[in-house]
């Protein structure tokens, strides 16, 4: 391999250099082509992978399980009820047990400190499948997807993230674009901007890569000339209704709708979303939002945009599997 990523963990977006990150994207594209052509070779035969999910997931779990299956690895899935981590057993002790049984561990949960503790004590690679602070595996897929849907070099791609920018997706899209030298626009209400900690990381990376960075509360300014518009959900299950009401009122001007897509001035602008998306009333939460707040045509994105040709969120979701496979092969492969 061109780069030696063997036995490396992935805990934050900035853990890898731009060249290492680009290598993972290139490897993912090669593995994707091989899967489509049915010429894929197994590089993880006999490996044991543990997936710890304190937060449930569709895409992350399926991406890891299919990637492992394709590459010959075995998987143990620990759901929120199937692990004692943080309840009866500390992250440190869990790491020291699982590290003796598995070749790698994936963790998806709230705690960034938790996943970092796993990596410190497990003695095997640990992958952050999502925490409250970062979503690094999603970023490899997002960069791959933008590259596939643009004829520009990665460093010339322009994208905006619109919405709650202090979220794990807000942090991650802020940082990955600055890492890779891209044109990054982060847009949301000032009260929901990334903290100084994340802005400082982004600015340091920007100085190294030559990235262009805008943080603004003006959606039309943010999307001008962009190739891609990203967003994510505004609310989460388990939050108090008062929080939902306040946040929805605050973020309604930041909904991705046909008008905002057109404001880019680029008819080829694509829409991206890590999913799930609240774009209609066909889910329990979607119907609840419609009933309580009168937003029957979607929350963070309208159904019109979501069902349009501009939406590439499903290609983005597929690429989760190819990029996670690349990460596994690069860090564990023979």
UniProtKB/Swiss-Prot annotation:
It is an enzyme of class 2 (transferase). Pfam families: OTCace, OTCace_N. It is found in: Cytoplasm. Transmembrane segments: none annotated. Carbamoyl phosphate binds at residues 57-60, 84, 108, 135-138, 274-275, 320. One of its GO terms (biological process) is L-arginine biosynthetic process. Belongs to the aspartate/ornithine carbamoyltransferase superfamily. OTCase family. This is Ornithine carbamoyltransferase, catabolic. It comes from Rhizobium meliloti (strain 1021). The gene is arcB.
